[in-house]
């Protein structure tokens, strides 16, 4: 796909407040994410996410994030929240991820104890997850959660992917311009980079992040 014909999509993850969701919509963010992974400080209950979903602007995707949740837990979220996209950060295989009849993203851990450049090759990923809508490369280690605020070496991203990919892990308004110019992702996913505290977003950081993404897009088009 010709990257120059596309703008960088933006996903704000770890949403816990309706006001933050409304602001994300006003800023033109493409997707907001609710976290249902056990142990996450940004975890919300399905009923809470359902209530906050009402604040979502039209044409903004609602993403449900899981990490080794049971099939019953995922089904409850799908039924209660009605997300448009699922995101899996654990050891879930393709059969599990696609069993909910919704498009899904598969996260690839790129932390120091995660996959190395040899393991994270496009062929292996696409053979393992042939039905994924795309991949998300994050800085956490296998079995760990995102939102750490740490980056990884972007040069380790696999080449030759035939699916869109999102870049995550330690991205904020100070480095997202360089991240986009360096990696040309289909989208960027941010949580801690626009926060005051886990789950509590900062309006100024949200605005600045979006501005920097748009600046990078204009740079790529010039």
UniProtKB/Swiss-Prot annotation:
GO BP: L-tryptophan biosynthetic process
Coiled-coil region(s): none
UniProt catalytic activity: N-(5-phospho-beta-D-ribosyl)anthranilate = 1-(2-carboxyphenylamino)-1-deoxy-D-ribulose 5-phosphate
The UniProt record lists the keyword Chaperone: no
UniProt signal peptide: none
Keyword vocabulary terms for this entry: Amino-acid biosynthesis, Aromatic amino acid biosynthesis, Isomerase, Tryptophan biosynthesis
E.C. no: 5.3.1.24
GO molecular function: phosphoribosylanthranilate isomerase activity
Superkingdom in the source lineage: Bacteria
SUPFAM superfamilies noted in UniProt: Ribulose-phoshate binding barrel
Associated pathway: Amino-acid biosynthesis; L-tryptophan biosynthesis; L-tryptophan from chorismate: step 3/5
Pfam families: PRAI
HAMAP family referenced in this protein's UniProt entry, alphabetically: PRAI
Protein family per UniProt: Belongs to the TrpF family.
Protein name as catalogued: N-(5'-phosphoribosyl)anthranilate isomerase
The organism of origin for this protein: Xanthomonas axonopodis pv. citri (strain 306)
């Amino acid at each position: 796909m010709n990257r120059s014909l596309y703008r960088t999509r933006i996903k704000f993850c770890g949403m816990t407040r309706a006001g933050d969701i409304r602001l994300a919509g006003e800023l033109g963010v493409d997707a907001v994410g609710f976290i249902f992974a056990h142990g996450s400080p940004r975890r919300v209950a399905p009923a809470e996410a359902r209530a906050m979903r009402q604040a979502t602007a039209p044409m903004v995707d609602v993403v449900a994030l899981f990490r080794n949740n049971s099939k019953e837990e995922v089904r409850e979220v799908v039924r209660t929240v009605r997300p448009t996209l699922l995101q899996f950060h654990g050891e879930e295989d393709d059969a599990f991820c696609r069993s909910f009849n919704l498009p899904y993203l598969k996260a690839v851990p790129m932390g120091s104890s995660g996959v190395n450049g040899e393991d994270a090759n496009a062929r292996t990923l696409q053979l393992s997850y042939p039905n994924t809508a795309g991949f998300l490369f994050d800085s956490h280690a296998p079995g760990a959660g995102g939102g750490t605020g740490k980056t990884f070496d972007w040069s380790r991203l696999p080449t030759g992917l035939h699916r869109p990919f999102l870049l995550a892990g330690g991205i904020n308004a100070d480095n997202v311009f360089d991240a986009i110019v360096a990696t040309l992702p289909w989208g960027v996913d941010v949580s801690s980079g626009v926060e005051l505290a886990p789950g509590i977003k900062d309006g100024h950081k949200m605005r600045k992040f979006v501005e920097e993404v748009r600046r990078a897009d204009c740079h790529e088009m010039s």
